[in-house]
Amino acid sequence: ISRVGLYALPVNPPQLNSLADLGKVPVITHQGSAASEYLKGIGGTVEQASRESLGWAMLQRGRAPLWATSPVVLRSVVASGESPPVEVLPILTLMEDMACNPQMDPEVLDSLRNALKELYEQGDVHALYRQYGVELD
């Protein structure tokens, strides 16, 4: 399970109570992400970044006041000593799965899904999230 929120620099972040308050405020998203597609689908203004680290750089440089990302991504791109962005509004909770070519052999896909399920069941995914300071519960 992954949570995506709208993040802003800690100095004077926009005050949002819901996505209806977003209006045409531009939001930086990772190109092709669920957040990007969701925000575009509700009429949001999206600035797409080709890499997560570019999203952080765009936010720092004022390209847009908000960045749609997850806590795991934040911890991976914000350098030690930098002031991390603050969450303004949570927007999506996603159940994670794998993206695979539609023509992939169904047996191979089932094997990969079973391996992913096993990683969750054995606690490996939780351990990885904890390593980056994120709790799934």
Sequence positions of predicted segments:
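Short beta-strand-to-loop elements that line the ligand-binding cleft
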Residues: 29, 44-52, 58, 87-88
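Extended ligand-binding regions for polar small-molecule ligands
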Residues: 10-13, 25-26, 33, 98-136
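Acidic, polar ligand-binding/catalytic clefts
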Residues: 1-21, 32, 85-91
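Periplasmic-binding protein-like
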Residues: 1-5, 75, 79-117, 136-137
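Solvent-exposed, polar/charged alpha-helical surfaces in well-ordered, non-transmembrane soluble domains
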Residues: 20, 37, 53, 57, ...
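Short helices/loops that flank or line small-molecule/ion binding pockets
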Residues: 21, 41-42, 52-72, 80-81
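Aromatic-rich, solvent-exposed beta-strand/loop patch
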Residues: 32-40
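Beta->alpha turn/N-cap motifs
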Residues: 9-10, 30-33, 52, 68-77
